[in-house]
Amino acid sequence: MATMVPTEFDTIAAISTPPGEGAISIVRLSGEDAVKIANKVFKGKNLEKVPTHTINYGHIVNPKTNEELDEVMVSVMLAPRTFTREDVIEINCHGGIVPTNQILQLLLSNGARLAEPGEFTKRAFLHGRIDLTQAESVMDLIRAKTDRSMKVALNQLDGNLSHLIRNLRQDILDVLAQVEVNIDYPEYDDVETLTTKMLREKAIEVKKSIQQLLTTAKQGKVLREGLATAIVGRPNVGKSSLLNHLLHEDKAIVTDIAGTTRDVIEEYVNVRGVPLKLIDTAGIRETEDKVERIGVERSRKAIEQADLVMLVLNASEELTDEDKELIQATSGKKRIVILNKTDLPQKLNMDEVRELVPEDELITTSVLKKTGVDKLEEKIAELFFGGIENSQSTIMVTNARHIALLNQAEDSLDAVLQGLDSGMPVDLCQIDMTNAWDELGEITGDSYQDELLTQLFSQFCLGK
């Protein structure tokens, strides 16, 4: 279904700031009657007569009782130069649950409707202010875990990904139009050969662009969702100390008693621009303790699901069978092997370790003395962003929906090429080319289903 701007919208209202105590809260209105409704409850200048994009001092009052609720500043922004392209009012009131909710309820009782999650952004999309990739980047920006992920989200919000996708769609549309002309009005005997050549070249060209975009998907997913990182090792080798160092706070219990971490602890941390979802696992060993055994089993699952494994070994002890089992169990994963406790007399046989672990995976540290941890952080950044240090200026694919649609478009282009290779008539190959055009259009929202909008914007917070 193509994008259509609805002819009528009611006026919506919501609190746009997080709930709780704070210096200031913002209550937002959007719609044809936004100014009229706000004016009913505002004591100060007549908001229906003030210039657009002005901030106006006054009080919110209950029109029925004339009771003052709060001293406020009201921003008046008239269509179309607003986020939603509707008239927008933003009431800056004192923070706190009670005054903010009282103002919201007053607006609702005077003609506004409580906005659904993401409805302001949805209206911006439906009015053509932004496309779907830009709408999704709004939430990415809110949820950004590092400076780098924030810059990538801003890049997408600026429309850089949209521009690239639309250029690819235009390339497809141009060749489809030319193919149609050649089929309907052939002027040369070899028109079929020329048309086939044209279709093939464009399918290859667009497919190559899609493949280049998909090469950024892995790093993009890391920036958007965080890198699932399991910290593993046998009990009491320093896993929890490492977690606490990376977090810069004590989240895990650190003692000299083996087996004190009996569950899986998850935390997000920014390491040199890489958002890590750190998982501190219970030490893996044979145990009779029922609770600890459950933690050990969860640890094994965490290793399977992790994008990166940090395997911690104790450099002050000899390599044990449990260490060797963990080295073997994690050998197929992207891995950093950390030789910890180097501040103590070393008993670890390095020749034995190097036989089992490649040299470039090894890092020596003393988390207690804070030595070697900088090299660990450098290693993490090098592993995942060595080739894209300037990722903030790169068009990246960070969204699973976009990745799926790009893969579908690539499959459609493969079908075009396979059809041409097998001698299929050009007009039938056009169908798959058109499918690729549609699938790319779903990324930007140039074509969409209503169910998609409902599902997508329901993930937003109220007031956005």
Swiss-Prot record:
Instruction: Indicate which residues the UniProt annotation says bind Mg(2+).
Output: S240, T261
- What Pfam families does its record include? MMR_HSR1 (PF01926), MnmE_helical (PF12631), TrmE_N (PF10396)
The GO biological-process annotations, alphabetized, read as: tRNA methylation; tRNA wobble uridine modification
Keywords noted in UniProt:
Cytoplasm, GTP-binding, Hydrolase, Magnesium, Metal-binding, Nucleotide-binding, Potassium, tRNA processing
The UniProt annotation places K(+) binding at N236, T255, I257, T260
**Annotated EC:** 3.6.-.-
Q: Which organism is it from?
A: Ligilactobacillus salivarius (strain UCC118) (Lactobacillus salivarius)
Q: Which SUPFAM superfamilies match?
A: P-loop containing nucleoside triphosphate hydrolases, TrmE connector domain
Described by its record, this protein's role is as follows: Exhibits a very high intrinsic GTPase hydrolysis rate. Involved in the addition of a carboxymethylaminomethyl (cmnm) group at the wobble position (U34) of certain tRNAs, forming tRNA-cmnm(5)s(2)U34.
So which domain of life are we looking at? Bacteria
Return one GO MF term: GTP binding
KW GTP-binding (keyword) present: yes
Q: How are cofactors bound according to the entry's free-text note?
A: Binds 1 potassium ion per subunit.
Q: Which Gene3D superfamilies match?
A: P-loop containing nucleotide triphosphate hydrolases, Probable tRNA modification gtpase trme, domain 1, tRNA modification GTPase MnmE domain 2
Name listed for the protein in its UniProt record: tRNA modification GTPase MnmE
Please indicate if the UniProt record lists Oxidoreductase as a keyword: no
Quote the cellular component terms of the Gene Ontology held in the record.
cytosol
**Alphabetized CDD domains for the sequence:** trmE, TrmE_N
Question: Which co-factor is required?
Answer: K(+)
Subunit structure, as described in the record: Homodimer. Heterotetramer of two MnmE and two MnmG subunits.
- Provide the family line: Belongs to the TRAFAC class TrmE-Era-EngA-EngB-Septin-like GTPase superfamily. TrmE GTPase family.
